[in-house]
Structure formats: C-alpha cells, structure tokens
Amino acid sequence: MAAAHYENFPVASLLLPSESRNHIAALYAFARTADDFADEDKYEGRRFQEINRWEKGLLAASKNQKAPLMLLAFANTLKTFRIPLLLPLNLLKAYRMDLTQKRYKTWKDVFYYCKHSANPVGRMVLYIAGIREEKLHRYSDSI
C-alpha cells in the first residue's frame, strides 16, 4: 500500500526499528485508506458511508470480530501497544471534518482540527515506539 502512494512513508519506514515496521505499516494503511475515502474521486457521493464503514470495521476488529484483514492487523497493533481506541476514532472524525470544512477561521478551530488529525497520529506513533509519558505526548501535539 505504501509504495502506491506519494508520501514519504516507504523511505521513512526504513529508518524505523524492524520490530516496529509492521505496526507502523498497519497504522499507515488504516489512516491512508480512510484518507482516500475522504479525498479520492472514486468515493465521491459515498465518502461518509465509507468512513462510517471503516469505523464499524475497526470497532469489530477491536472486539476480535469479523473485519477486513487490514483492520484486524491495525487492531492487533492497538492491542499490542495498548493504544487507546479513541485515537483512531478521533482520526476518523478528522476525515469527516475534511468533508464539511475546507478552511478554518480561527487558530482555535485549527487546533481543534489538529486534535483529531495530526495529534492522534503522533500519539499512536509514540505508543508504538514505547513512549507512554503524557508529557511527551503533549510535546508531540504541539509540533
């Protein structure tokens, strides 16, 4: 999946410890797929439905129920590193926000968006890296 997209993930993933790569790849696949639902033309007219379906699948996977393999892999990452389910759910909220809001009028609005978009990703990466201290998570949020 990573090689098919235009981001820096394929190169960056080589810099990660080998034991983290599959988990970072699972996070990337989860987020990239949801982002595609919000952005790609082929999902026009059904973007909310696809994001909602993805969330439903994540919730099922997190309960060891039938779900797409990609979500089962990501749910395994969440369990392995005790990542709060709220983080990926917040990220899905950000993708929904992308569908209704293109520009933000105030910094407060921008920070609220970041609370649901960039911050959860940074925090999930920190969990995978074994960093659980809330103070360090807040530092990540402020980047």
Where in this protein do the model-derived segments appear?
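Acidic catalytic motifs of isoprenoid enzymes
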Residues: 1-143
